[in-house]
């Protein structure tokens, strides 16, 4: 069902022919072929190999006792806004709906654009590149979901993460990097453009990374190619190109203008929570069976699920892979597996502290209060500024 469709003749060189009025962004590689640019991006590490993972590998259950927990949590948080967190199964369904289906099917992309929603002002226009943000604590499967989306759709993976582009295309050449990546992504659909640590791209300031370049150096070039103030954008909503951002610390965009730019850039913001109890049970069982343990004891699995609360799915997978090494699996027939072998390695893993998880949840609630996509003028940022000016004037008097 999910097939790759290549355009018969990638457009190069001249821009705007056949279209009246708007002119596209400057093309610094107009004299180079798509094949040459593709090889160049591969050699520079921008186009990367996709891991062999599928959406079903994001193991998790629905919240079967959600109504009970929701009622209890609502009573505890009566003084503040509260929205129940999604279960891993719901996250898997949302990523499939918003990312996999539109990217894998041109028919879905053309006739059922899922990057639109209804807000107070009416229908919001589709965004170029259909940007989607996955936010959640470290180890909650954001990177795996990126590779799963690319693998399920047979897409090319372009990595524009600041840490991956350090030392590459310095200075003014950053525009060439962004434009070339989006140009090749459009010419060879389906394509996924991945930006990890997305909060650093939208945080203002001149804080430099390890390579001497600020992480936000690609922001203005992304805006110039996707949402230009004048002229046509490089990508259109109909293109099977997905800009997928991931963030473990989205709350670092503290300033009102940074928050507005961050949430306003993405059409969808999806929260990846820590696994709940039934999801931890499923994950322990799946990982033990994958490692070579036949029919894990259900009572022992329930114990593991209880003691692994506040641990991420990544930590659970890491513990199983460390404990059940190839040599240990070969000795399972002579020395049966015991749950005690996992408790020590699990204790050495760093749990996700409640304060960190709460910060991410609060940030996600803030995006929902802005209408789910962070309209720049839909939240409290502008009102605070106006109020601040008035209060400041009174103090001066």
What residue spans do the PLM features occupy?
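Walker A/P-loop NTP-binding motif of AAA+ ATPase domains
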Residues: 82, 86-302, 380, 397
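Low-complexity, interaction-prone regions
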Residues: 11-22, 237-243, 373-379
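Eukaryote-specific, cytoplasm-facing alpha-helical/coiled-coil scaffolding segments in long proteins
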Residues: 133-142, 310, 348, 368-374
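Conserved AAA+ ATPase small/helical "lid" subdomain
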Residues: 238-242, 269-270, 274-276, 281, ...
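Ser/Thr-centered, proline-biased regulatory motifs
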Residues: 15-20, 380-397
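Polar/charged alpha-helical tracts
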Residues: 39, 43, 60, 75, ...
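Extended, charged/polar low-complexity intrinsically disordered regions
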Residues: 1-99, 103-104
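Surface-exposed beta-strand-to-loop junctions
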Residues: 35-41, 53-78, 157-163, 200, ...
């Amino acid at each position: 069902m999910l097939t790759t469709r290549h355009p018969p003749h990638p457009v190069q060189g001249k821009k705007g022919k056949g279209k009246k009025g708007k002119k596209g962004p400057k093309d610094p590689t107009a004299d180079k072929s798509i094949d040459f640019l593709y090889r160049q991006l591969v050699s520079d590490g921008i186009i990367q190999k996709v891991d062999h993972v599928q959406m079903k590998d994001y193991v998790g259950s629905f919240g079967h006792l959600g109504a009970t927990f929701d009622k209890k949590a609502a009573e505890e948080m009566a003084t503040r806004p509260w929205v129940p967190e999604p279960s891993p199964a719901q996250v898997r369904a949302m990523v499939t709906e918003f990312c996999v289906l539109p990217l894998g099917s041109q028919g879905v992309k053309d006739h059922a654009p899922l990057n639109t929603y209804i807000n107070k002002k009416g229908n919001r226009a589709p965004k170029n590149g259909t940007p989607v943000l996955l936010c959640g604590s470290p180890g909650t499967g954001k990177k795996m979901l990126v590779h799963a989306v690319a693998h399920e759709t047979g897409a090319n993976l372009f990595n524009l993460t600041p840490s991956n582009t350090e030392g590459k295309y310095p200075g003014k050449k950053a525009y060439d990097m962004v434009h070339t990546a989006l140009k090749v992504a459009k010419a060879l659909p389906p394509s996924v453009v991945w930006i990890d640590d997305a909060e650093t791209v939208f945080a203002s300031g001149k804080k430099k990374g390890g390579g001497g370049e600020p992480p936000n150096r690609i922001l203005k070039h992304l805006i110039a190619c996707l949402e230009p103030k004048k002229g046509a954008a490089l990508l259109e909503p109909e293109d099977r190109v997905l800009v997928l951002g991931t963030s473990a610390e989205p709350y670092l965009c503290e300033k009102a203008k940074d928050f507005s730019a961050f949430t306003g850039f993405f059409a969808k913001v999806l929260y990846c929570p820590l696994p709940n109890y039934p999801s931890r049970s499923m994950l322990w069982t799946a990982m033990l069976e994958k490692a070579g343990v036949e029919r894990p004891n259900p009572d022992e699995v329930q114990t593991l699920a209880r003691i692994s609360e506040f641990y991420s799915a990544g930590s659970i997978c890491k513990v199983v892979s460390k404990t059940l090494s190839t040599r240990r699996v070969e000795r399972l027939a002579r020395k049966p597996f015991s749950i005690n072998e996992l408790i020590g390695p699990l204790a050495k893993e760093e749990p996700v502290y409640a304060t960190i998880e709460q910060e991410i949840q609060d940030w996600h609630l803030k995006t929902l209060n802005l209408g789910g996509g962070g309209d720049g003028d839909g939240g409290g940022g502008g009102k605070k500024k106006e109020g601040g000016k008035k209060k400041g004037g009174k103090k001066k008097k």
